[in-house]
Amino acid sequence: MLLRTKALIRSGGSIAKYAAANPSCFILQRRGLRREFGPKYTAKINEAEENWQARAEAIKKGKKQNTWDLFEERGYVKDTAGTKEHIAELMRTRRIGAYVGIDPTAPSLHVGHLLPLMPLFWMYLEGYKAFTLIGGSTAKIGDPTGRLKSRDHLSSSDATMNMTKIHYQLKKLWENVDTQMRARGYEADWARKRGIVNNNHWWNKQPMLEVLRRVGHALRIGPMLSRDTVKNKMTQGDGVSFAEFTYPIMQGWDWFELFYQQGVQMQIGGSDQYGNIISGLEVVKAARESEPDPQERKYVTPKTALDECVGFTVPLLTDSSGAKFGKSAGNAIWLDPYQTSVFDFYGYFVRRSDQEVENLLKLFTFMPISEITKTMEEHIKDPSKRVAQHTLAREVVTLVHGKQEASAAEDQHRMMYTGQMTIPQVSRAKDAATGGDQYKTISDQPVTLNNAPRIDMILPESLIMGKSIGRILYAAGLASSTTEGHKLAAAQGCYVGGAHRAGGENVTMNPDLISFMPVKLWFPGETQRYLINGNLLILRKGKHNVRVIQMVSDVEYAASGQTYPGQSFTGAVRKLNEIMKNLKEKKLTPEEAKNAVNELQKSSQEKQQGQQIIFPEEKSRQKKDMETKLKQEMIASVKTIDGMMDEKPSVRGDGVKKQTQDDRDPYKW
């Protein structure tokens, strides 16, 4: 969400003087919104500034490392917008803000996104302000950089799906960075800030005419046409559209909005983003000079070189074979555990060569250089143990998926390659999860970003449009039954995503502004009002248990082979009757029918495992009797094939099978 920051300072004292000298460090809110800080807050700001100046003095005397020097030491810097000396001095003296922008053109981040994010995470650890920008609006245009063919147009529902999933991936990364910060012993710093911002927040309100009026005159087509990426697309590709020409302007305006609202003076980009960063600097400069409000112009207009914006790009990484880093057999290594399993993700880093592993430890971990040196010394003693590779894999998986998943994945790999027979499963067994198992939570643990179930799913139109919200919550795995789903909705214990537009009955949710409001009991026909783009429903239970549900036709859902909890005609009794029918019609042999029954029983027993039954402690004898009976029922075999053939189901006069006591018993077929 867009973080609201503090307004201009009109009060007296040292803060006002510092604000006048350093306008970018005290952030403007929307025009005309100014307020004074109270004495306690003023004292906190003064203390934070004094601490930062003490830090700057320690860096000057060589007692502490400059963060820019850390970047160069670890290999994060490729091209710079601004001299290295200027950037180093800026980072020494100012608690600047920095950002990395990501367009949600795919449903997940991949390993390649981690490289520009790592210096941003380091800045956060060192006490700066760090922001990740989701390009909800710029993704609709598509960055032409490095492409010969224009990106395929994203539908509104796909864009919303991608935007939501990437938002939660970034939240997960930031929480894991916080965990690493505490584990590495970084001191608490009140002025340290981080945030996730979506450029939909201003592009949905900002007229393009106003943007062009303020910055259009400062940009020239010639320099844009002279870039290699544009030349290649025009001569070897499908040409550059007018929309793609506007992309650098939109990206530059994003930077200005972040500067205006959060004091962001630095942009960090991938190896191919240098041209966009240079264009962004021109847009920010033009926007600052064309500020229409005279009162605010004196604050946004740069007074010294340290008020100017800067940027840099990270290098392009390739592995020992020359392939682009983050690819395996031509496929991206995704951060989504359901697209690249935790086991495979860990394995990708374990397979790195000895020649590249030290560099990767510097780039993708928060390990101090001294610790990396010791790891490499231990690795050299016996390279076959792959000590450095396992350290790299463990650190990266901890950052992306959490410590518990990293430990489990490490155990899996070590036991697999040491010949042990028993291989432990990762905590949520994401690697083996299929169908409805991907949406289950751990019964005895709270849902966190690291153990949350899969977000995206499909459900049939007949359910979404024709059933109650309680049934939908049950089908989505957010409730254990339809009854619980109704109770959740009645108590407003779950939420629907989107910004509802006031108006007619059929006016649907706004796909560009994803916020959440409590779910209420509504008629099945009203669900349509909460769909985004007519086919996307976003639900949330708790803080992190989210479902982005794509509504598909019943035919398409049936073709997918999936089922959902509470789906009609999928019960065990009905499946058994179907086996009996196929047997009598000789579509199955007795042996095939027996195997089908055994599979059905096995599936039922697997579903029942892990569902803990709690017995009253005061009735110890009753508890023992019930536990014994339950165990007997769960391991009892079904009737023999001959018995099934001889038995005739009870049938009413209308030909419909009556429900017998065995049908009602959940532990019998």
From Swiss-Prot:
Motif 'KMSKS' region location, chain numbering: 324-328
Swiss-Prot/TrEMBL catalytic activity: tRNA(Tyr) + L-tyrosine + ATP = L-tyrosyl-tRNA(Tyr) + AMP + diphosphate + H(+)
Region listing for Disordered, in residue ranges: 596-627, 641-669
Subcellular locations according to the entry: Mitochondrion matrix
Cited PROSITE patterns: AA_TRNA_LIGASE_I
Effect the entry attributes to changing residue 127 to E: Splicing and aminoacylation defects (mutants C-18-1 and C-18-2)
Domain of life of the source: Eukaryota
Keyword field: Aminoacyl-tRNA synthetase, ATP-binding, Ligase, Mitochondrion, mRNA processing, Nucleotide-binding, Protein biosynthesis, Transit peptide
Sequence positions that bind ATP: 103, 327
Binding-site positions, L-tyrosine: 99, 143, 247, 251, 254, 273
Pfam families membership: tRNA-synt_1b (PF00579), TyrRSs_C (PF16714)
Ranges spanned by the short sequence motif 'HIGH' region, renumbered to the chain: 104-113
Compositional bias per record (Low complexity), positions renumbered to this chain: 601-612
EC number: 6.1.1.1
Involved in splicing, as annotated region: 33-75
EC class name: ligase
InterPro entries: aa-tRNA-synth_I_CS, aa-tRNA-synth_Ic, Rossmann-like_a/b/a_fold, S4_RNA-bd_sf, Tyr-tRNA-ligase, Tyr-tRNA-ligase_bac-type, TyrRSs_C
Main location: mitochondrion
The keyword RNA-binding is assigned to this record: no
Family recorded in the similarity comment: Belongs to the class-I aminoacyl-tRNA synthetase family.
General function of this protein: Catalyzes the attachment of tyrosine to tRNA(Tyr) in a two-step reaction: tyrosine is first activated by ATP to form Tyr-AMP and then transferred to the acceptor end of tRNA(Tyr). Has both an aminoacyl-tRNA synthetase activity and is involved in the splicing of group I introns. It acts in intron splicing by stabilizing the catalytically active structure of the intron.
Protein name as annotated: Tyrosine--tRNA ligase, mitochondrial
